[in-house]
């Protein structure tokens, strides 16, 4: 493909299935273009005109016939028979196209209307890389491997429970439209919009459950202190959700609401704490705190609320609803009604029984054309008996799709078992949560494992390479779709690009080839090389890893304490400096696009944070070494302690000054947050005070938080290494896409 397109190759992502170069070139004039359209709907024709104007064509003229047009687009019976036959040979003809550039213009034949639009975005992507409008003569025949290519960005994420909002959750309508344009031009055809926590839309029947006037403490650089503000979701300030659903649908993009099945379901559990699942005295004595999200399904008020919620969401125009089971794995509601109904069952079987019951109830009230899906059965044991899967399959409404199937666990054998039990047509998503892990870890560069030490490479698994292997395995086994959980956009665009590439053309590129191509697609040739290099080398360290007295975070369990840890951190310091130099060079480039600048700037903030965390860890290790060696030079120990605290505070300053939502929240009665550096600072002070006295007195009132997503995932401490060692058998069954 790159040979056929030459210097234009990086402009296309996903790369086409087939491109053949011909002789000559065609020059398109930006001041005017004559267009002939046949067979498209009015909405599709409107998208054609909108895209051409966006591409810079000043005047659009309608040609009387195909031969008089600079650009001819046709679908249906007007497509020559030989081209229809060629498109029908592809996996999904209705989304496929043939684009021919030559003879003074371009012709697009679509297997369906959306296929024609994909041909158009391919043409315009090429033209965006041609300042003079000249393109090589080329013949492209192209179509997707997977019918549904989905990404899951966040509209809200644990809002009113663990977070107020960050990243995409703060976007207004125009920014969401720009993102939908990005998805359309990268041939993504569904968005699974995450709405966890207080609802980001009006809900007159339950106004207390929407994200309005939430009290949030945010940092003021001007006064150097926290201030309390009132936060209302952008869609409630200036509604845009229904408009962007229509806008996306016009571009062939389905919009799904991704919500909790019985947890984080709007603000009801916070506004009505009596409605929560109840913990037994035994569980309370054991220290359980995480009943703040789950609702008691035996209560009539809860059932009425949940039914009203799904009906309201459908009313907004969503094309489907994707429900997620609670991630709790150790207990189920202990109220008398639940004990009577489910007390004879293990906690997870009780949870699944309620899930089935709710899904049947939702099916009754939702329209037949509304897609219904579920993420469930995700808890240990990861490897489940076939009979267990078959039992739950038979209880599930046939209409319900699966938005979770196993990742690489058990060398993909568990995934292949799910394909056989549930059928590939029912599987729309696997466990592709690399960007979700990055968000859970507090917006750090958790992208590829190349930057991890060997001890963590043997543990880490939810990264970009893992996502790609899962996408390929889903394509190989004929699954209906693939889905990338894009919970973090800024600086993590590669996860979205991977979903676009591997859902469309799963075998065109190795992982390394994809990274090289995607980096240059995003930043151009010179800056793309810089970006690829820094992604391969930028260290990824969670704050808890530089503190030996805090519990291990489930996703990043190892500690960089001791001689080996200090040496690793010293190597990382040099890598962080090198990455920062590359980022400064990128940001100094004239004429960066808004997307390029926001990506580079977000990555720069992450790199600066990594440098400060690394330096804090280095000085803390040096302090421990001096102390443990029995050296009693108090002045030297104080210098090391001060340096460790300075760099830890610098990390916290970067967080507070560049992100909106950074302080722990106690709306649920439990301190919850995503940034652990205040705890690290307090633990450092405890260590220093033992030897150096009151000057380092810790804050006795410091909040010790639980992570918004980390509590139910402690089982990963056992399973992480097994998953990291797993072989992606479903993804290596042959580059021809052999079926399982």
Where are these regions (language model features)?
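Substrate-binding groove of N-acetylhexosamine-processing glycoside hydrolases
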Residues: 1, 5-15, 19-22, 27-31, ...
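Acidic, contiguous N-terminal accessory segments
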Residues: 1-111, 132-142
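Feature activates predominantly on carbohydrate-active enzymes
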Residues: 11, 15-21, 44, 87-304, ...
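Short, Φ-rich (hydrophobic/aromatic) sequence segments
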Residues: 44-52, 117-127, 309, 342, ...
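A short acidic (Asp/Glu
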Residues: 45-46, 202-205, 267-268, 332-336, ...
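Short, well-ordered beta-to-alpha junction loops that form the rim of enzyme active sites
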Residues: 196, 260, 323-327, 375-377, ...
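Active-site groove signature of glycoside hydrolases
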Residues: 291, 305-341
